[in-house]
């Protein structure tokens, strides 16, 4: 595959300029066949690397466009191969004409993620760094951007390298003892090995445990909007998303299925989940929707219990019997909606009665989703309730489920090593578990990953990356 020279459009359609990437052993030669520098003299192949050359793309005698060509020589390029980048005007016609000329002269169309895959195969980055490229492209908040950038720059890779070096040192001491078992030579006492195992276990556990935070940062804090029918859940969702995502109607039971979408508030990505209203119903479809409501409630980090302020007292039993027990370890906010329908005295009475019945520690807020009253304050409450740590580019937080699974397997293996040391088992059994731990950590970096897994990972990239 790496013997082919590939090309692809690297920019989105509709922009003022467009960019085409060419990479492979014939990248400079093929680009030079269709490109003529504006200044006569040097051919493209004679230009210095890391330079921009102004000129024109020709199809025979016909000029296609005036362009800039960037030149990179192996191994000092993104892919580690000879590469060019052609920057032209953003017309889709021009871009397609240039692509056709490149393919006609020996290029083939790149597969999704093939540029980054080549960078990985050519040793420009490990697999975790390659995956971070996709995360950086998809980042939608300051936190996801910082985490992806940290991983792409090798923060996670350095942690893995240090762990593998310690484990290799560990297993070498064990296996040396096995080699000299007949001579009764001890290269490291068991207490020293146990301390080393504890040190390794602590780092792996920290990385694995960081996934609970990393996953929320990457995919959004799940917020379930729950309540009885016609409490204003769909109206609130539309306000929070600033678009008409959900159908709003006075008819009870309008929302029958779960509606989800994400939005960035205060630098944090929230995943809002609008659910079917809870009520007694004989409608089979609506009942299934209510079932899903409780499923989503269980999966949420934050629960907004929507209450129609004009009919709030009737919900106390449902709230205390069915909702509170499910929210013991969640952030629950009571959202009294339609506040325009009650006066200040009624508002104070409601707050007092709910506080007396369910406890004053439950947070509450009065809003009008329809009139957008106090919805800004609700957003501020959501940011505070998220409890996400401040993320810097130096933080190593796991956001990828593949990495998390490998870390948990590595953690299981090092736990067996600790148990084996305590039980004073034979060194050959310890060595097997240490090597298994190394295997799972190496899998994250792509050192032992099979071709099918690689193909699946890079297939999720865009064509030009």
UniProtKB/Swiss-Prot annotation:
InterPro entries: G_TrmE, GTP-bd, GTP-bd_TrmE_N, GTPase_MnmE, MnmE_dom2, MnmE_helical, P-loop_NTPase, Small_GTP-bd
Example GO BP: tRNA wobble uridine modification
One family name in Pfam for this protein: MnmE_helical
Signal peptide feature range: none
GO cellular component annotations of the record: cytosol
Cofactor dependency: K(+)
Cofactor annotation comment: Binds 1 potassium ion per subunit.
Residue numbers binding (6S)-5-formyl-5,6,7,8-tetrahydrofolate: 21, 85, 124, 465
Entry EC number(s): 3.6.-.-
Sequence positions that bind Mg(2+): 234, 255
Domain TrmE-type G residue range list: 220-387
Residues reported in the UniProt entry to bind GTP: 230-235, 249-255, 274-277
Top-rank taxon, per record: Bacteria
Annotated positions binding K(+): 230, 249, 251, 254
GO molecular function: GTP binding; GTPase activity; metal ion binding
Keyword annotations: Cytoplasm, GTP-binding, Hydrolase, Magnesium, Metal-binding, Nucleotide-binding, Potassium, tRNA processing
Subcellular locations according to the entry: Cytoplasm
Iron-sulfur listed as a keyword: no
The family this protein is said to belong to: Belongs to the TRAFAC class TrmE-Era-EngA-EngB-Septin-like GTPase superfamily. TrmE GTPase family.
Subunit organization: Homodimer. Heterotetramer of two MnmE and two MnmG subunits.
NCBIfam families, per database record: mnmE_trmE_thdF (TIGR00450), small_GTP (TIGR00231)
Family annotation (PANTHER family): TRNA MODIFICATION GTPASE GTPBP3 (PTHR42714), TRNA MODIFICATION GTPASE GTPBP3, MITOCHONDRIAL (PTHR42714:SF2)
Function (record text): Exhibits a very high intrinsic GTPase hydrolysis rate. Involved in the addition of a carboxymethylaminomethyl (cmnm) group at the wobble position (U34) of certain tRNAs, forming tRNA-cmnm(5)s(2)U34.
Protein name: tRNA modification GTPase MnmE
Organism: Bacteroides fragilis (strain YCH46)
Taxonomic lineage from the root: Bacteria, Pseudomonadati, Bacteroidota, Bacteroidia, Bacteroidales
